[in-house]
Amino acid sequence: MANHTLAPEEDYDVLIVGDLNNSGTEQCPRDDATVLLAHVVPQLYTTVFLVGLLDNFWAVLILVKYKGLGHVENIYFLNLAISNLCFLLTLPFWAHATSHGGTLGHPMCIILVTLSSVGLHSEALFNALLILQSYLVLFHVSSFFSAARKVPCGIITSVLAWGVAILVTLPELLFHKSRVGTQQYPCLLSRPHFLSGKDTSWEHSLTVKTNLVVLLVPLLVFTVCFVLFLRTRKTLGSGDRKYDLAKLVFAIMVVFLLMWGPYNVALFLSTFKKFFSLSDCRSGSALDRSVQVTRVIASTHCCVNPLLCVLLDEAFRRHLCCCCRLGGDTARRPPEDPAHDRPREGLEQSTSV
């Protein structure tokens, strides 16, 4: 029979949990963070699910029905909304499992982990692609960059991004298992029987992978493009459509990094706490609490992007009003044909979502 070492200190759903049960280590008393989250998470996740489902649905509707997918930016925005929906679909199950316990079998655990992880990793990749695309729209007109702005290129890069997101999720499926009869940890990571009890390389690898894809790659792309943007922004006016696109895309990336960055940092410190001399009970308890709290906060991000579009993009607000106006002639207007748009006019579509 497989001899799994359970990892009890953290996370109800996805990514990494540590291992406090290694032999020879000090057994530390539990704090009340998990109990508190068990009361907060169900209501919070249910609210986020309802809000996120509604606003991401409107985002998809506006992109497909009104703006069309004739621009690479709109293709990336559509995939970004789909990524958020993948993540959103798991929240009611985590909320129910956290409040009732004993409801997740192993197949359901794997399905939820897959949706959650693929949604998160793909969102990080599409944020990076949007930053790169907005930079190309702003400053490059050569034939190579013009080819990169064509729809076939957008479709190919989207397929590749989804493929990468699925590939980096596969290792997590090997280590996740359900835990029946608990309200706190319905789905967690465990060490497979074929690894020795002292082998923590699998946990380190998963943490590094998560930090690399979700934090470091988007942060690197954002930093490079933002520095280049600051060096050349004087060539753009504040009312330029290209400037509006960049403002929206950079705002989306900043919010993503602010909400997911703390979780990735806390996760890294928790996993490598022995290397940072943070293995004592007090530090370990603080790290466990930080990972749990930052994870819950980060999970609410999946409903934020459409709200940013409403705040920052006039075209999105206009089309949203068209969607809500019953019987209006404007709402029945077919998607715009990019073949008849002038280059500057086409950028209006790029800023809509």
Predicted regions: what is each one?
Residues 1-54, 193-201, 206-211:
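Extracellular N-terminal segment of 7TM GPCRs
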Residues 1-29, 314-353:
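Intrinsically disordered regulatory tails of 7TM GPCRs
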Residues 28-30, 105-113, 146-154, 167-216, ...:
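Loop architecture of class A 7-transmembrane GPCRs
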Residues 37-43, 72-130, 137-148:
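Extracellular TM2-ECL1-early TM3 structural module of rhodopsin-like
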Residues 45-49, 62, 86-101, 113, ...:
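Helix-to-loop junction signature of class
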Residues 53-64, 88-92, 118-142, 157-159, ...:
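Cytoplasm-facing ends of alpha-helical transmembrane segments in multi-pass membrane proteins
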Residues 158, 188-203, 207-214, 227-266, ...:
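Intracellular effector-coupling site of seven-transmembrane GPCRs
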Residues 261, 265-267, 289-342:
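Seventh transmembrane helix
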